[in-house]
Amino acid sequence: NSIKEKTTPAVSDKMIEEKTDYDTVKEFCDEKSKEIAKELVWEKYVSSAKVNKYPKEETKRYYDQLINYYKQLAAYNGVTLETMVSSFGGYKSVDDFFAYALSSAKSTVKEEMVVYLTVRENNIELSEEEYKKQGEELAKEYGYENLKDYESANGRSAIEVNVYTDMLIEKLLGEDEV
């Protein structure tokens, strides 16, 4: 058995309709362009903020979550953390992985700080109705049956950060003053 000829399928409306939630290539491309624009705008906004001091408790919480996740993954696969991060994670050493985990934790904390500061400085409030509406949309997007299941897995405050982030991105894209 061998591959004699490679054929790259043409992207068509039919393929898009069969493989995605979109009906046409244009719809798919338009939506993906919007998503990329949102990500780029948000990344630029967050990166423009300077953090003077990271709160230890929150940073440690996110750091520990990531470390514990990899420890559980290693245990599940019957390997050590060192094997897990070097063989499967692509890190040269456990110390490199720990440095990545700290950087990742700080990134998450910075993003939350930016969200809460921007929301507070701009008097942006999240009504219960808006929380439920956007929370349900996010729940579906992340593969949960409903908002209640999403809250059970992630907690209300994490969902609020996501909802506020989406609100802020819309304001930034809409060129509202933020």
Stretches with model-predicted labels:
Residues N1-D95, K106-V178:
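Peptidyl-prolyl cis-trans isomerase
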